[in-house]
Amino acid sequence: MSIVALIRDARADEAFALEALQRRASDVWEEYRAQLAAHPDAITPPHQAIAEGRVRVAVDAAGRRLGFSTVLPVHDRRCELDDLFVEPEWMRRGVGRVLVHDLATRAHTAGASYVDVIANPNALGFYTRLGFHVTDETSTRFGAAPRMTLALPRSATRPEPR
């Protein structure tokens, strides 16, 4: 049974709360703490993405935010997962998986055949378990990162973990 009771669109009044969630989730990776502290502009409130309906929030039965995802618009049958962050105490409990399933369903409905992500190297196993595969490596402001792709089945609405 999932701890996620609902996935909903983010509201404008929670942009700063989502920014704080992203900071807490990012701080679990010790190797990025100093870089994020030196570049606080790397994490900003997702005002524009919220206004465009591209941010989804997973909440529990009490309405607490457990995590969120941000996607870029579908272009050329591809959708890019731009952000996926889960509260540290809820990591490894299915929240990220449920958010990816939600975005895959929505991307498929919007006409996408693929979901792309530039993955944190620490999350490579997570994405691989959901069916993503490495297609390339790219540079980010914090170093090299794998570019990964998930092919969306034509008839299925969401990926299943392997």
Which sequence ranges carry the predicted segments?
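Conserved N-terminal entry element of GNAT/NAT acetyltransferase domains
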Residues: 1-13, 152-162
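Conserved GNAT acetyl-CoA-binding A-motif
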Residues: 107-120
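Conserved catalytic-core motifs of GNAT/GCN5-like acyltransferases
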Residues: 116-118, 133-150
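Glycine-rich ATP-lid loops
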Residues: 88, 92, 112
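Conserved active-site tyrosine of GNAT-family acetyltransferases
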Residues: 127, 132
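Acetyl-CoA-dependent GNAT
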Residues: 9-83, 87-88, 100-102, 106, ...
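Residues forming the Rossmann-fold NAD(P)(H) cofactor-binding site
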Residues: 93, 97, 101
